[in-house]
Amino acid sequence: MSRIADNPVSIPKGVEVTLSGDNDIKVKGAKGSLAFAIHPLIQVVQDGETLRFSAKSTDKRVNALRGTTRALINNMVQGVSQGFERRLQLVGVGYRAQLQGRKLVLSLGYSHPVEFTAPEGLTIEVPSPTEIIVKGYDKQQVGQAAANIRRFRPPEPYKGKGVRYADEVVVRKEAKKK
């Protein structure tokens, strides 16, 4: 059983955490602000520069929910202070990306260019034509935007062509033999 909920979340300098009575938490920092509704069976206590989590029940599901809540709030604190980024690579002949304002234009071997508009709160950088960096303060939103870009052309197993995460390992298949 994981004991992740037993570890307190430390609040760095420059991050302001507000707990309201109706189980809402607001985290505000240099990069932005996030809000989260805490489950009624989970209690969050702020003592100084740390947040502690306790369950109002001894049920296994409530303990699991306590760990999930702790992880989500830790991601919120980390996001508003440092931010998150996800790197993508374009592998394939003629596969390239370019940025036009807030719009990412991808050439992925289709008969038409694929366009992706960055949601509010996210920034997209294209340091080279085959590299994309998605940055933001909401971890879930950064990961979802990167997954949406990857979904336009996921890596195929025979040649490895497609859009992949920078740290992704594509398991290759052998071609059919006659």
Swiss-Prot record:
Gene3D superfamilies tied to this protein: Ribosomal protein L6, alpha-beta domain
TM region(s), chain numbering: none
GO aspect biological process, one term: cytoplasmic translation
GO molecular function, one term: rRNA binding
Function: This protein binds to the 23S rRNA, and is important in its secondary structure. It is located near the subunit interface in the base of the L7/L12 stalk, and near the tRNA binding site of the peptidyltransferase center.
Family matches, as PANTHER family: 60S/50S RIBOSOMAL PROTEIN L6/L9, LARGE RIBOSOMAL SUBUNIT PROTEIN UL6M
Family: Belongs to the universal ribosomal protein uL6 family.
Record's protein name: Large ribosomal subunit protein uL6
Organism: Nitrosococcus oceani (strain ATCC 19707 / BCRC 17464 / JCM 30415 / NCIMB 11848 / C-107)
